Amino acid sequence: MIHGIGVDLIEIDRIQALYSKQPKLVERILTKNEQHKFNNFTHEQRKIEFLAGRFATKEAFSKALGTGLGKHVAFNDIDCYNDELGKPKIDYEGFIVHVSISHTEHYAMSQVVLEKSAF
């Protein structure tokens, strides 16, 4: 049974501007695992695209959950990783989480579908 669907779209330039002013933005948005992946990218633009994609994913996840970001769930509570095929995944107790992330030159977007787990 579907619990919720969330979608988020972010301008990559907006994330670039925030990152330029606040380098600690990475620590605020990304988990330790995500930070490790971020730091392994050699091209600065790819880092920003990754950061924007994860930002959009976490926003979309919180919308699907129905809480938004803040009191009930924070950026660092949501760890988005890639499986062996490269598919983005989020583990969250009680739910099966379906994630899609996409980028263009100017935008990053993510859609998250939360399905109640039968177990």
From Swiss-Prot:
GO terms for cellular component: cytoplasm. It is found in: Cytoplasm. Its cofactor is Mg(2+). Its EC number is 2.7.8.7. Pfam families: ACPS. Its main location: cytoplasm. Belongs to the P-Pant transferase superfamily. AcpS family. This is Holo-[acyl-carrier-protein] synthase. It comes from Staphylococcus aureus (strain COL). The gene is acpS.
